[in-house]
């Protein structure tokens, strides 16, 4: 893992990754870039409890500045949007706000200001509850 570190990377967004398959829980202490993890509440491919909620909780990742956003009712494939689709791209504002905040882009929308998601698809930062 140490050989993969790159000090230029300041922030990372991961959507529905299989955390337990890709990372050892003990490696969480060595992650310097801030992580925004997004998971759908109905993701059956990479379920949110074993692959997002539990790893974030067990490692104390929220106390280190990492965040977990759950998307209510979303499955593994509904978190993406393609050009020309009727469904708006909900992930864009969330990811942009996260990156703006971590990179301290002046005058830009921030993750902590909220406002991402919409009335049909709720996006909730559950990090403080872990």
Pin down the residues of each PLM region.
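Preference for short coil/turn "hinge" residues that link or interrupt alpha-helices
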Residues: 2, 67-70, 114-119
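Residue-level recognition of the N-termini of beta-strands and the immediately preceding loop/turn
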Residues: 9-10, 66, 111
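Surface-exposed loop/turn and secondary-structure junction residues enriched for glycine/proline
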Residues: 12, 22, 49, 59, ...
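Active-site-adjacent alpha-helix of alpha/beta-hydrolase-fold enzymes
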Residues: 30-92, 96-97, 101
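Residue-level preference for alpha-helix termini and adjacent loops
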Residues: 21, 30, 76-78, 110, ...
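Primarily recognizes the serine-hydrolase "nucleophile elbow" in alpha/beta-hydrolase
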Residues: 1-27
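Catalytic active-site module of serine/aspartate enzymes centered on a nucleophile-bearing elbow/loop
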Residues: 85-130
């Amino acid at each position: 893992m140490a050989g993969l570190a790159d000090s230029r990377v300041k922030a990372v967004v991961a959507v529905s990754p299989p955390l337990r398959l890709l990372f050892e829980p003990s490696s969480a202490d060595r992650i310097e870039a801030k992580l925004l993890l997004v998971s759908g509440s109905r993701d059956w491919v990479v379920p949110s409890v074993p692959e997002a909620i539990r790893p974030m909780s067990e490692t104390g990742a929220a106390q280190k500045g990492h965040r977990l956003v759950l998307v209510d009712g979303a499955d593994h494939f509904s978190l993406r949007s393609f050009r020309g689709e009727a469904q708006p791209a909900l992930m864009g504002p969330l990811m942009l706000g996260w990156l703006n905040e971590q990179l301290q882009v002046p005058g830009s929308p921030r993750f902590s200001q909220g406002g991402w998601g919409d009335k049909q698809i709720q996006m909730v930062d559950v990090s403080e509850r872990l």
